[in-house]
Structure formats: C-alpha cells, structure tokens
Amino acid sequence: MSESQPMMDIASPGSTGKEKKTPKAKENKEKKTTTPKEPKVTKTKEPKQPKEPKQTKEPKQPKQSKESKEPKVSKEKKTPATPKEPKDQKDTKEQKPKKLTKKQLAAQQSVTTVAPPLGTPPPPTTATTTTTTATTSTSSTSTSNSQPSTPSILDLPSPSQSTKKQRISTPSTASANKKPTVNKTSKKIEQSEDDESADNDDDEDEDDDDDDNNSKNKKKNNNNNNDEEDEDEDEDEESESDSDFEKSNRKRKKIFQKNKNRGRLQSDDDDEDGSGSGSDEDSDEDSDDSDSDESDSDDSDSDSDSDSDSDSDSDSSEGEGNDDDDDESTFNLSEMQVRENTQMNTLIKHFSEDQQTRFEYYKRSSFQRANIKKVMQSVLSAPVNQTSAIVMGGIAKVFVGEIVELARSIMEEWRETGPIRPRHIREAYRRLKESNSIPYYKKSVPKSMK
C-alpha cells in the first residue's frame, strides 16, 4: 500500500475525473497476397459414336407338330347289369310302412358260420350255401323261417361236409361272442333294398312337396281374391262418397241461383218504381252492391245448410227459421240501399255544373287524422284510438258539408253575391242547433250547447 495514487486536478474546469484516451495507432495490417488462379482448361468433348443398330430378331420357327398320339385302346365293355324289376307304384295316400333300421336288416339277413359240435343235429335241409344267388337265399330264408325241418338222427354230417360252414338257426353262447360273417349276396340285397327305400322316400317327398305347393297356390289365389274384393268395396265406397259430395254441391248451386233470381227481380222492381233516371256509373255501383249482398246471403245460406245437415232434425228446423230471418234482414237492407242510391241519382242528375264540381270536391276532401285526434284528446282528456279518429273525421266532414250548404242557401235568401261570409255560417249553425241536428259524442246534447 506504499504506492500513492495520483490526485485529480479539481481546479481545471474541463476535468471530469476521467483521463482522455489517447488514440492508438492502428497497425497496418499486412495485406494478404492473393495468388492468381490458374485458368481452367476447357475440355474438348469428343463426339459420341453412333450406336450400332440392334440386330433384328429372327422369327421363331414353328413348333414341330407333336407326333400323333396312338389311339387309345377301347376298354372292354362291361357286361350289362341285370335290369331291375319294375317298382310297384304305391298309392300316396296309403300309410307308410315302418322302416327297419340297417342293424335290424343286418340282423335278419346275417349268417353266422360256426362249426357244429359232434352229436348235434344237422341244419335244416332247405338251408343253402354261400354261393347261392339272391333269389334262392331269400326263398330259403323265408321257407326256413316259416317251416323249420325236424332234424333226424340218420342225417349225420359226413367228414367232407363237417368242414363246410353251415347255418345254425339258434347260435350258442360261444358263437354269440364271435362276429357274424355277412355274405356278398346279402350285402347286395341290402344295397338294393336301401336303394328301393331311398327311391320310395324320394317319391314320397316329391309328392309331399307337390301337395305343399298346391296348398300354397290355393292360399295365394284366395288372398288375391280377397284383395280384389276389398278393392271393389273401396271403389264402391269412394263412388258413394263422391255421389254424396256432388249432391251437396248441386243443392248449394240451386240455392245460389234462387237467391240470384230474387235479387234480380227486386232490382228490376226498384228500377221500375224509380223515375228510370241515373248515370251508368251509379247503376253499375248499385248492381255491384246488390251482387255483393246476394253473395253474402248465399254464403250465409250455404253455411247454414252445412250446419243443418250435421245437426239433428229439430236443430235443422230451428236453423231454417234463423236462415229465413237473416234473409229478410238482408233483403230489407238491400231495399234501403237501393232507395238511397236512386234518390242520389235523381239529385245528381239535376245538378248544375257548379254543384257537380263542388260535389266532386266534397267527395274527395278529408280532414287530417292527426288534427282530429288532437281535438278529441283535448276534449276527452284521454288517449284516442286511430279508428275512432277516422270515424270522427267522417262525421266532421258531413257536419261541415251541411253547414256550408246551408250557409250558401242563406246567402241566396239574403240576396247577396260573393263568397260565404262568417255571418252566413253563424246563421247556419244556429238553425242546425234549433233543429237538433248537430252531432255530439254523447246521446244527449248538453244545455250549454242549446
């Protein structure tokens, strides 16, 4: 710690406590000498030699035809088998005999060969050896079973016969343990019988199949017949329902035509009663109104008819009475409308040009619904419905029209010319009040307005 550190010069104004770094002279780096690259030697490409054409393949030589084979030597024909006896045709309806199993058949036709002991009686004379044919064996077995021959003492077996196999009717206990030897003929018989039984079974199975097919066909035919009958019944029911529907339509058409004829007669009578005056447009409107009324009445009649058909007899009679009342009421309304229309036509016919123009303006004029709604709400102090405002607008239109017409008549009475004055309107309003023809929203007019 003996070394002293240099003190910083505080008096120097530009000293910041850090010594300025002296720029180090960069050593000139030695430039690397780059050795020039040797120019690449361009290789001269040798032209490729054309390939030699491939040798064409020689056509294959046709194969040598194989030596004709030697004809086969025809084998010796087998001796024709003995024809089988014709089968007895069995009735299909006869009961089937109980079939015997193969074991039972083998037990019946088996031949047990045992050397008889000395002193035993010889076998029955009808027994045959193993070389006998099928027919002789069957006949011998049947005769031996049916008529057994009685043994005799004199018929003793010779030494040559004792070595042969003989048939014994009842085998002894020693022979019971030995296996029975079956002859070839017995095997053939068994096979033939099995074949016959199999053929019979096949025939019976075919007969059963035929019976089943016949029964199935009968069932199908019956089902088809039943289906056809059901379809016929459905068609009959549909035709009946169609006929009922047509009848009801005819009734409705008749009622509609009757009502039309009534309306036409009534309109003709009304036209005759009137002066016969009126424009073509008004007559068309009258006919349209009458037709609409008649159509409404026809609709009500048709509805009432459909209701009366569904109800009982008493209800139908009451419904007919109600329908008559409805017809009378609609008839009265149509009469009133026709009279009013005829009166209007007569008045319009006598209008002057000025009156016709004023009438057209009157028809096309209307009050604003918003203004009428405000007036009604201020009077009633309650919200007003849109429909009520429309109705009140129509009433106001009629009321104002009456006042204007009355004021014009008053102006003519006073023999004044010019437009309508307020005094004319006041006089008209006074006269309407006296006649109690001022519209009001209540039934009775208040005393203040009288």
From Swiss-Prot:
State the source organism's domain of life. Answer: Eukaryota
User: Gene3D superfamilies given for it?
Assistant: Histone, subunit A
User: Which purpose does this protein serve, as stated in its record?
Assistant: TFIID is a multimeric protein complex that plays a central role in mediating promoter responses to various activators and repressors.
Keyword Nucleus found:
yes
The primary site where this protein sits is nucleus
Cellular compartment(s): Nucleus
Subunit (UniProt): Belongs to the TFIID complex which is composed of TATA binding protein (Tbp) and a number of TBP-associated factors (TAFs).
GO CC annotations on file:
transcription factor TFIID complex
Map out region (Disordered) in residue numbers. Answer: 1-329
What family name appears in the similarity comment?
Answer: Belongs to the TAF11 family.
UniProt gene name: taf11
- CDD domains, per database record: HFD_TAF11 (cd08048)
Q: Which UniProt keywords apply?
A: Nucleus, Transcription, Transcription regulation
* UniProt xrefs under InterPro entries: Histone-fold, TAF11-like, TAFII28_dom
Listed Basic and acidic residues bias regions: 17-97
Q: Where is the composition biased (Polar residues)?
A: 158-184
A biological-process GO annotation: RNA polymerase II preinitiation complex assembly
Q: Where is the composition biased (Basic residues)?
A: 249-263
Among the Pfam families in the record, one is TAFII28
User: Which named protein is this?
Assistant: Transcription initiation factor TFIID subunit 11
UniProt keyword annotation of Nucleus present? yes
